[in-house]
Amino acid sequence: LLASSAASDVYKRQPVLNLGWFNAPASRGMLMHTKVFGRYEGAEEVMSVTPTYTEINVIGNYAPTAKATVTVMDGHGNPVSDACVEFKLYNYAEFYTVARKQTDAEGKAFLTAGKGDMLVWASKDGKFGYAKLSFGKDHELVVKMDKTAGGGHAVDFELVPPPENAELPAVTPEQRAANDRRMVHEDSIRNAYVSMFMTDETARYFARRYKLDEDAVSRILVASRGNHRVIVDFMARLRSEKSKRGGLDLLQRISAKDLRDVTLEVLMDHMQSRMCKNADHFRRYVRNPRVSNEILTPYKGFFKKAVSKEDAEAYKAEPMKLVAWVAQNIRVDNDCNLGGAPISPEGVWKARVADAHSRDIFFVSMARSMAIPARINGVTGKVQLIGDDGAMDVDLNHHPEEPVFMAEGIASKGKLVASYKPIRSLDNPKYYSHFTLSKQTPQGSLQLLSYDEGDADMGGGTTWSNLLKEGTALEAGDYVLVTGTRLASGAVLSKTTFFNILPEKTTEIELVMRESEDEVQVIGNFNSESLFTPLPDAGSAARQSLLQACGRGYFVVGILGVNQEPTNHALRDIASFKADLEKWGRKMVLLFPNEAKAGKFARESFPDLPSTIIY
């Protein structure tokens, strides 16, 4: 578990302090950190220091900890100074860096963490090495940095999380009852607000009134939730058939979150985008306001005023002139934006300085304002211009007098194909849930390839079958495939496979999901003759046993905490596996603690749950 020091909904809705997230879950934490303004001189371990804040390690406030020292050696046994040491935690099927340190003159770096396992990855000048570190068991660890990219091999890791160390405070019946009353009041406020959102029925009525596509309008307005008035205002302004098609396309290009907070000013600004010849490129890479993770702004109108007509026409005719202008005029200072949120394109124009990511967003935004199709590649993170021949990488760091396309325009690519032998209950591994791909950088570190994860409510996303079964194109280079099987104990059986992609060649590897001999582990006793009362709309309200309802064999039983975040997250996760669970065909019994709780459950909030559920 990795966390920053922020309270959660689970914590705030408990009857007493330290009952929710900050107790049992936090006791299994590996690293927690927070930021303190200015230079901090306290007892906590310092993670990093910036001109405005100090980041400190506060894991000791929440979980038992241990300190470990890592010594990085080269292939001859000599200590390596100034090597990058990354402490990695298995999370979402990748080894995610939770702390990054530099070795001292003796090749040493240290970290204090919860008593579980991490992967330590050391790199410098293209060489790297790695080893598993068990905090609490390994007080010293030597990492031999003797590997270079290019060699194909695989290594297995079993990573064990810290044990739970819960110290639950007592809760009196009076405290529980008082908290239940508060939750009823809070839920009434929330439900009163949610009741004002547009439903499928009201959205379709609006669509018919304004002669818009009913299905598209319904999806958009229901998804916009509390921002539906802005979306309705925008749609009502779409008069011609062309503008109606364009407006709906624009709304379907932005993310679900954008629909919930985009402003009318932004939508109107981007509806007036300049045209380019390729209609598909215009929809995806010109009119689309979303570049990366920035706050959406009406930047097209801004640049129309800020950039002269002559310059805009020159950039459109020769986009590399825009690359040269940005490389020469926008100074990159990664310390100027310590908060991390991207600087707006307008802000970059005015300041002429930005962090590298904000600079990249600025370039794409400026290009789109001039009808030059451009994007930041969602998988690799590279800035690209889009032409009839495909996507071309541009190097905004190159010498401004000699701007060129990287790899002479289009990067050389090969193909990756992975075979997979299904294990029980998993016939199609999912990206982020079961496997990830990362590219090795020239320095020796790893950069995740960020494929589509799908939508928690709608499913979809990247899987083995739609990415690797028939093969996918990758830039030439060295890569790592990480797979992981999570056990009931929380431990992970991982396999890390190193491989190389050559230009115009196909690389074939095997995607392996490791299994435990004790895959189904007994974690408690369960009486399948236990009785429950189905809700009236389930067909029968007569009490029956779980065995009667589900039959023998596998089934799932869950107890719902109504309107609580852990339950809501779990239900959305279940909804994303609707097709798989219905194909499995076994029953799922979701229980409520009592009739009062059952009455508060809004089933319409989770429309995509499997049909195999019994409430």
Outline where the language-model segments fall.
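Short active-site neighborhood of thiol/selenol oxidoreductases, capturing the structured segment around
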Residues: 546-570, 574
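Single conserved hydrophobic/aromatic residue that forms the stacking wall/gate
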Residues: 2-7, 11
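Short, acidic Ser/Thr/Gly-rich low-complexity loop/linker segments typical of extracellular
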Residues: 1, 91-112, 133, 443-468
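Short Pro-Gly-centered beta-turn/loop motif in secreted/extracellular proteins
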Residues: 108-119, 124-126, 133-136, 456-489
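Short, ordered, surface-exposed loop/turn motifs in non-cytosolic proteins
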Residues: 67, 75-94, 115-116, 423-454, ...
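Secondary-structure boundary elements
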Residues: 14, 82, 186, 190-351
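Structured interaction patches on ligand/partner-binding surfaces of diverse proteins
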Residues: 126-148, 486-514
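Short, internal strand/loop/helix patches
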Residues: 589, 600-615
